[in-house]
Amino acid sequence: MSEIDPQNDPSFRGAYNEAYQRRVREIPFWKSLILLPLAIFLRLWLMTLRIHVSSEGVQRLFRDKNPLIIIFWHNRLLISSELHRRFRRWSKVNGLVSPSSDGAWLAAFFRMLGIGAVRGSSGRRGGQAMIEIHKKLSAGEDIAIAPDGPRGPAYRFSPGAALLAQKTHCTLVMIPSKFHCAIRLRSWDGFYIPLPFSRIDIDPKFITYDKMWEHIPAKSLAEEFRQTLLALTED
């Protein structure tokens, strides 16, 4: 991956100069224990799923020891921790979580599932979150991103993931998930909840760094990535 100093790189300088001491809400450890039964229940639920990944996808997920930027649509995020546990257990994964009070509970829940949390959003502490994500990738850790989260609209691709791919030279892994038996919520994204013991088919698409990305605006590159993932998505 590319070695970049976020303090001096023009694309990150504005983020670095942001007042990054903005308050990040946290909850005491003893309060987070309230979430433990739910975390155990969800882990057991996810363990029953029959996740079928294409043979090439399995090989690349296991073989690639470099940090990856893993892309899910927001409505398919429920299986992200289980997918990583099964196929990239040796690598730590981190997710982007809001710095708000609600985000504090989600970050605590993520930790119980073995997922690290980078606190930030497009509206609050976004610049500092970009820097922290870069540090995680530099340390060899994966990053999982829902480019249309947390508020949508559904299937929108935020330029942030494209900017990270441009500046870190990390491989993007797009995860299109086909659910054979799932409940779909009436939420803004139509969130999927796969039923226990149901089958999920995944054929990951790996997009390696291309030097041409440096000459494409992040928004244009994000739209290109969006079209790629949409073409793989089955609703």
Walk through the language-model features, giving the residues of each.
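Non-catalytic C-terminal accessory region of glycerolipid acyltransferases
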Residues: 2-46, 60, 112, 116, ...
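A short, well-structured juxtamembrane/interface segment
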Residues: 43-67, 78-80, 85
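A broad, low-specificity signal marking well-ordered, structured residues that form hydrophobic/aromatic
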Residues: 49, 68, 93, 143, ...
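Hydrophobic alpha-helical segments
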Residues: 54, 85-88, 108, 162, ...
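Conserved beta-strand termini and adjacent loop/short-helix elements that scaffold enzyme active sites
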Residues: 54-56, 98, 120-123, 205-207
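Catalytic core of membrane glycerolipid acyltransferases/transacylases, capturing the structured
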Residues: 66-123, 184
